[in-house]
Amino acid sequence: MSFVPTSTAIVQSFAGALYGRQIGTVTMAAVNRDIDNVGLNSTLNSYFAFSFGNETATQVATRVVTNLGITEGSANAIAYIVGVLGSKSASVWGQTVSEILAAFSSMTADATYGAAATAWNTKVEAAAAYTGTTDVAIGTVVSTFTLTASKHKKQRFTNRFLFNFGNTSACIRLSVFH
């Protein structure tokens, strides 16, 4: 199953396939202003021209196939993208990449590309739900923290938990109300 084609999902797919990034809230707000001003396709074409306008169709196709996680059938996927881009004016390659991504997202039952399409859709859905404030590589965990019983203390107050992370005065304190 493909993702719901909202402008957010389309932009996240475009950013992931071309830039290897998921868009945070600050950048998404700027993108939405651009979309409001000139429309989605014009925005994608503008971003593409600015960032990749000097690349060949083969370079773009290789970048997209790599970022989509296509390993099986990658040569055929690159050839397909090169063919589609080659049939269009370079001024609409951003929109064309978006159309290729939409077609790819529906290939979940395909014997060759199905697993990659399914994994890609999962990444796009996660990116669309992303509410962070910074832009990070698509699929990146922003931070993790492992708690160990010997170094971390938990104190219970009325309807509130207070966690102290660390054993010095410079520890991190987290209050959780419930």
Q: Which residues does each PLM region occupy?
A:
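Substrate/cofactor-recognition hotspot
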Residues: 1-178
